[in-house]
Amino acid sequence: MTRSPDSRNHLPDQNRSRLRFTVLALLTIVVVTAALRVPLLDIPFERDEGEYAYIGWRLGFGELPYHDWFDQKPPAIFWVYRLALSLPLDPVRAVHLVGMVFAAGSACCLYLIARRFLGHPWGVVSALLFALISVDPLIQGTAANTELFMSLPLLLSHVLYLQETTDGRGGKVLPVLLGIANGIAIACKQVALVNWLFMIVAYPMLTGKESRARRSLSFALHSALGMALFWGGIALFFHAHDALDDFVFNVFTHNFDYIQTIPYAQRWSFFVDTVSTLARSQLLVWLVAAIGLATTWSRQGTWLLVYLAGWAVASMVGVSASGYYFPHYFQQMLPPLVLCAALGARWLYSLGRGDRVPVSAKRVLCTAVLAGLPCVTLYPFLFHYTPAEAARSIYPGNPFGDMPAIGLNLEKVTKPDDRIYIFGAEPELLFYTRRLSATRYIFLFPLFGPYEDALAKQMQATEEIVAAKPEVILYVPNALFFMPGTEQYLTRWTKAYIEQHYDEYAYMTRNQEGVISLKVCMNGEPPPIPEGDEVAGVILRTRKV
């Protein structure tokens, strides 16, 4: 059968129209993502960002993570930060700007995924909802954390995965590219490995019946090849720099111990606390997502239910790996959550078919249900809070919002080659001052878990500190240092070392609004503490002459 001339002319018009809509949709997604994030670019670093920024800074001096500085995160995050720090911008703004680019790319990928089973309009809804919730301060979405950078290659792998499973024309190249994308995601955060394992398990259920076993095996092998190529390159790099053993221990061995440190009762407590916080902005989205998942079977068939439910379960495994359930861990749950919510919203929208419910009213209602609570949460951060106030609101009880000012003070009273020992977990101060840490442990969490080698590591750290002769000690112990079963040798040693060699320089005090100020000692005497203020558990000390 041949097509009529009118039919042949009509198809190119449809393709051009579809392309125009796609381009317009992607531009809209990018613009909205930028509009949501640009006002938040100046929020000061939190501690994870501080560690990445510090190591990214030291990369410019030929130093390496794992070999020169301890860190348990995979390597990609440090090179992304190094790229951001090379921009001619304020470092905090530059890092968050690069994060914004990744966030926009992730939202665009989610649109390409969603339109396959939701169509173009609801695909745009999915992407815009993702852009909104992913920047939610309650989920710590303003920070340039590993989940933010992991999301783009992970979602790109899903774009390729759906093309492979539904179209079946990818041959061997597409699975290899998918494996490379997964490898990049894992290089941002190890838990992305669960995403690839889910794809392997779900593949036979999502692909066609013809040659299912052969195609599933081929997909597994070729995607594994893609990951092996990428990670093989990483291993060769560290081997060439005599740092392979350090890389393996930090990124893998230590993390296997790390994820076993939290008992199940405490895991549950952490989970409940975080979910209670996230519910303030996401509760209605969760309910609509549950409706979407429940109605998927009857409307779309088995494959979509398997895909979305499996993706959600895999993401939850990643969230749960360490047991701490920090809010930013839940960012990896957002893609399947948003897709299910869009399905649920579309189902609710379809209930009002006919003239009884105006289209405009349905649109307003769906928008309010999905975006209302997140918008209420985000509003003061966009229009009222200063960057420091935003940091205090997002991370109550932490000094992140006031660390830039404290860092500026320490930069003035120290020399560029002076070293700082932080008895705590505030590596962002090292970055703000551009001063080297007195020990390779730029934050001390790896020394205070119930690890068999904790005492040996703490003793090694004391040797490094003595050799470095730090000009300044920042004493700001974290509550996690004192969890049951933690070795306290370094705590006792630090107190004795301070007593023998250091004088008080300043107190960090916190007022009732959570603002931290630096009170400098006068003539060796403690500064007066205003009534109602408290010493924030932080004392800065300088060496005795």
Q: Where are each of the predicted segments found?
A:
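Short periplasmic/luminal acceptor-recognition loop of GT-C membrane glycosyltransferases, typified by
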Residues: 178, 196-197, 387, 396-449, ...
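Transmembrane-helix motifs of polytopic, lipid-linked glycan transferases
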Residues: 31, 97-117, 125, 132, ...
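Hydrophobic/aromatic-rich transmembrane helices and adjacent perimembrane loops
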Residues: 194, 316-317, 322-360
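Specific aromatic-rich, kink-prone transmembrane helix
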Residues: 149-168, 174-182, 337-340
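Hydrophobic, aromatic-rich transmembrane alpha-helices
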Residues: 279-305, 309, 341
